[in-house]
Amino acid sequence: MFILLVLVTGVSAFTTPTVVHTGKVSESPITSEKPTVHGDNCQFRGREFKSELRLEGEPVVLRCPLAPHSDISSSSHSFLTWSKLDSSQLIPRDEPRMWVKGNILWILPAVQQDSGTYICTFRNASHCEQMSVELKVFKNTEASLPHVSYLQISALSTTGLLVCPDLKEFISSNADGKIQWYKGAILLDKGNKEFLSAGDPTRLLISNTSMDDAGYYRCVMTFTYNGQEYNITRNIELRVKGTTTEPIPVIISPLETIPASLGSRLIVPCKVFLGTGTSSNTIVWWLANSTFISAAYPRGRVTEGLHHQYSENDENYVEVSLIFDPVTREDLHTDFKCVASNPRSSQSLHTTVKEVSSTFSWSIALAPLSLIILVVGAIWMRRRCKRRAGKTYGLTKLRTDNQDFPSSPN
């Protein structure tokens, strides 16, 4: 009995978890939030290829490139932190201008001293990964214009399209934000017949593009945070090129029907083939019931991914994904369309989201029962056949025993 008591006491001592107490007796203990990682080294995945070039005094968001691959939201034991390369302290420290929301680091407003390399670190109980993002903050002067501008190209004598980029987080957080377009210092108002609204405030159409339309454009969005308004400026350099031989874009995905489960996160890529060799000015976007995605879903439940252009075996492709987070029943009755357009041709492909059947299948559940019935039926038939054969043999024997044979001559 004494030996049994010693064994039980020893096992309980080894299995009791270590806890950190808050210091108040009335409060329950909480476990330490720092995950255990084998070794203290993180695997560095490299630097994000795109640097963030922003203006001083404006809001800035830095996205962690590891987030789409880490599935942070689905695990309560995963952690994502931010730090600056020249500092060992984690962000936000005591800096009221910086905070972390999900996988995004917010800086509001940005100052030139914020320029530098930022490290996002993803940890869980089994591994640790890091990637870096470069931020450069410039003064809002004419001299900084070439450094902070996005290059966009339009073909001569065609309908040009300007896109105000990198506003996803601000639009979803500020549904009432207004966007105004400027060419140089001139406001492009609704009365201007050459510049037309595309139905989406982040896009501007240029009717019959000419060489005079080349130059610098600005799109300015008003963003309100804690009752204070901030301007978010994106500068665009438009270059107009003469008509060239453009390839006809061929949309090779998605399928006409996309299976999905309600409540799940869904990514539908629109992949467009652009031919071989030469580069292309093809633009790809998504529509929902003939409405731009940002206008159809101002809260950001459905969004467009980045415009990704790449090559495979000397073949050029461009890809833009449609991201559902999450899928709802409304999506089952929505006509989604991927559009690929360049000066030579415009192509589109419709697709719909279809709810997949439940993971529980009656055919699978009834399969064992059907097998049992089949086996029992086979056994019953076998026994029945044996009984019939036995009865036939008995009757034959009985008739043979009772048959009268003619007597022998003797």
From Swiss-Prot:
Its membrane topology: Single-pass type I membrane protein
PTM summary: A soluble form (sIL1R2) can also be produced by proteolytic cleavage at the cell surface (shedding) involving a metalloproteinase.
> Where does the record place it?
Membrane; Cell membrane; Secreted
Q: Which keywords are on file for this protein?
A: Cell membrane, Disulfide bond, Glycoprotein, Immunoglobulin domain, Membrane, Receptor, Repeat, Secreted, Signal, Transmembrane, Transmembrane helix
Residues on the Cytoplasmic side? 382-410
Q: Return the Pfam families for the record.
A: ig
What this chain does, per the entry, is described as:
Non-signaling receptor for IL1A, IL1B and IL1RN. Reduces IL1B activities. Serves as a decoy receptor by competitive binding to IL1B and preventing its binding to IL1R1. Also modulates cellular response through non-signaling association with IL1RAP after binding to IL1B. IL1R2 (membrane and secreted forms) preferentially binds IL1B and poorly IL1A and IL1RN. The secreted IL1R2 recruits secreted IL1RAP with high affinity; this complex formation may be the dominant mechanism for neutralization of IL1B by secreted/soluble receptors.
Main subcellular location: membrane
The disulfides recorded in the entry are C42-C128, C64-C120, C164-C219, C270-C338
Q: Which GO cellular component terms are attached?
A: cytoplasm; extracellular region; plasma membrane
According to the UniProt entry, its GO molecular function terms are: interleukin-1 binding; interleukin-1 receptor activity; interleukin-1, type II, blocking receptor activity
Tissue and organ expression note: Strongly expressed in B-cells, with levels 21 times higher than IL1R1. In T-cells expressed 5 times more compared with IL1R1.
Return the similarity comment. Belongs to the interleukin-1 receptor family.
InterPro entries, per the entry:
Ig-like_dom (IPR007110), Ig-like_dom_sf (IPR036179), Ig-like_fold (IPR013783), Ig_sub (IPR003599), Ig_sub2 (IPR003598), IL-1_rcpt_fam (IPR015621), IL-1_rcpt_I/II-typ (IPR004074), IL-1_rcpt_II-typ (IPR004077)
Domain named Ig-like C2-type is located at: 35-136, 146-237, 249-357
Q: Which Gene Ontology terms describe the biological processes this protein takes part in?
A: negative regulation of cytokine production involved in inflammatory response; negative regulation of interleukin-1 alpha production; negative regulation of interleukin-1-mediated signaling pathway; negative regulation of protein processing; protein processing
Q: Which residues lie on this side of the membrane: Extracellular?
A: 14-355
**Which Gene3D superfamilies does this one have?**
Immunoglobulins (2.60.40.10)
* Glycosylation (residues): N124, N208, N231, N289
How this chain assembles, per its entry, is:
Associates with IL1RAP to form a non-signaling interleukin-1 receptor complex.
Chain segments annotated as transmembrane: 356-381
Give the protein's recorded name.
Interleukin-1 receptor type 2
**Signal peptide span per the entry?**
1-13
